[in-house]
């Protein structure tokens, strides 16, 4: 999702000091499954990627960042695909500004993990593996 490419420059108390690229490399080493990562700041590119993999991947773990609260287009895309989606957020969106407390995407996701830092991704993978 948007701004993950600059994660280590955000509020350190919420987002930590590790870049997402570094975290992703460590995450891949922990599991004997294929884990692909795609990041874009452009809504249309995110939709294109979801459409590309949404009928062939086993799962999508999606952090749509700010688009979570604004993108009807991403919500519509999630409704169309057959792949189950787990929505994750590093911060607790429900403890943030009012505009950030509503997800347009959640109703199209099998579950949501919020506010547990980068560990949210690991928890999503653990759920997928437990199956």
Model-predicted segments: where are they?
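Short beta->alpha junction loops
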Residues: 34-44
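Short, glycine-/small-residue-rich phosphate/pyrophosphate-handling segment
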Residues: 36-37, 86, 95-131
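Short acidic/histidine-rich motifs immediately flanking catalytic phosphotransfer sites
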Residues: 53-60
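Short glycine-rich anion-binding loops that position phosphate/pyrophosphate groups of nucleotides
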Residues: 2-5, 65-68, 91-93
């Amino acid at each position: 999702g948007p701004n993950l490419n600059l994660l280590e420059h955000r509020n350190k108390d919420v987002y930590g000091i590790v870049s997402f690229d570094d975290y992703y490399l460590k995450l891949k080493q922990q599991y004997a499954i294929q884990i692909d990562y795609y990041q874009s700041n452009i809504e249309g590119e995110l939709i294109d990627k979801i459409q590309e993999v949404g009928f062939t991947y086993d799962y999508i773990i999606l952090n749509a960042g700010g688009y979570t609260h604004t993108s009807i287009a991403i919500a519509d895309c999630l409704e169309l695909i057959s792949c189950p989606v787990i929505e994750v957020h590093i911060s607790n969106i429900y403890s943030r500004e009012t505009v950030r407390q509503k997800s347009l995407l959640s109703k199209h996701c099998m579950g949501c993990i919020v506010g547990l830092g980068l560990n949210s991704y690991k928890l999503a993978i653990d759920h997928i593996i437990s199956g």
